[in-house]
A protein has these predicted regions:
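N-terminal, well-ordered alpha-helical segments
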Residues: 43-47, 65, 80
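N-terminal ordered "arm"
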Residues: 2-56
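General N-terminal targeting signals
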Residues: 27-31, 38, 52, 58, ...
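Active-site helix-to-loop segments that bind/position phosphate- or nucleotide-bearing substrates
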Residues: 52, 58-70
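Preference for bulky hydrophobic residues occupying beta-strand positions
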Residues: 12-14, 67, 125-127
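Extracellular structured ligand-interaction cores
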Residues: 7-9, 62-64, 120-124
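Internal, well-folded beta-alpha domain core
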Residues: 70-271
Length: 271
């Protein structure tokens, strides 16, 4: 029997009736990521504490997050996009200026867009950081002062279970393999053969209120316009039911769910 080294993490179990985590690389047919990005989760934590230094802590590897979830289906619906400004007569128009000519008003841009949306999403989120910060997050998230939304405001979340502390172990005892109970994100470095699994690209944007304060791309709070594209990065998406031999996993910890071990793929900021 392998000796187990245990540490605590904060667990959030959320239900979203509908959700869109828009892939910024898609346009006329806008697609959704299957789960929220890690920075989206950091944004929820920032909003709960009403402070904006957690993103920097995540960048410094002082906070790790794990994003898991299962959903019932993904459907596509039709959206009519209208771009313009509302004027006194309730018409929607665009201002257009040309070289050395006065501004003129033209009809607004209108175009059809197809958009993916997730139906009936259950999220299982884990956060690992220092004990004091975990206690602060637990206190605030146990009694939220406002509606919890994951990413965009329409992605309203409800607790399936109250936030709680769980024990995370470094080893998987004497097991040779594990089967995922939840779909999850993993870093390519977690997997021996990461090229075998679906790879998704993410875009990270920094928001600067002043030179010392930065906001997460999905902070979910009032914030200034993006100041710069910070980085592109890739994560693997692993689906529920996939089996993995432990020898093919690297830097992974484990959680007991219904007396069975579930791998936890910690995601932190990597330059």
């Amino acid at each position: 029997m392998v000796n187990q080294s245990l540490e605590q993490a904060l667990e959030l179990s959320l239900f979203l009736p509908f959700a869109v985590f828009r892939n910024p690389f898609t346009f006329i047919y806008t697609q959704t990521y299957p789960l929220p990005s890690p920075s989206t989760i950091v944004g929820i934590l920032q909003k709960s504490l009403n402070r904006f230094d957690l993103y920097d802590k995540w960048k410094k590897h002082e906070i790790d997050v794990s994003v898991k979830g299962n959903y019932q289906s993904v459907f596509t619906h039709y959206v009519r996009k209208i771009k313009g400004e509302l004027y006194f007569d309730n018409s929607i128009l665009n201002k257009v200026s040309r070289d050395k000519e006065p501004e003129i008003l033209l009809n607004s841009d209108r175009k059809p867009v197809f958009e993916q949306e997730i139906y009936s999403l259950e999220l299982l989120i884990h956060i690992k950081t220092d004990q004091q910060l975990l206690e602060e997050l637990y206190k605030k998230l146990s009694k939220p002062q406002s509606i919890i939304s994951v990413g965009r405001a329409e992605n309203i979340a409800f607790y399936l279970r109250e936030p709680k502390f769980v024990d995370i172990q470094e080893n998987a005892s004497d097991q040779e393999s594990v089967t995922l109970k939840y779909s999850t994100y993993a870093k390519p470095s977690h997997l021996k053969d990461s090229e075998k699994y679906l790879s998704l690209s993410f875009l990270e944007v920094s928001y600067a209120k002043d030179k010392d304060l930065y906001y997460s791309v999905f902070a979910g709070v009032d914030r200034p316009v993006p100041s710069q594209i910070e980085r592109f990065y890739k994560l693997n998406f692993l689906e529920k039911g996939q089996e993995f031999f432990l020898k093919d996993l690297q830097g992974v910890e484990f959680l007991k769910i219904e007396n069975e071990l579930e791998p936890i793929f910690w995601i932190n900021y990597e330059d």
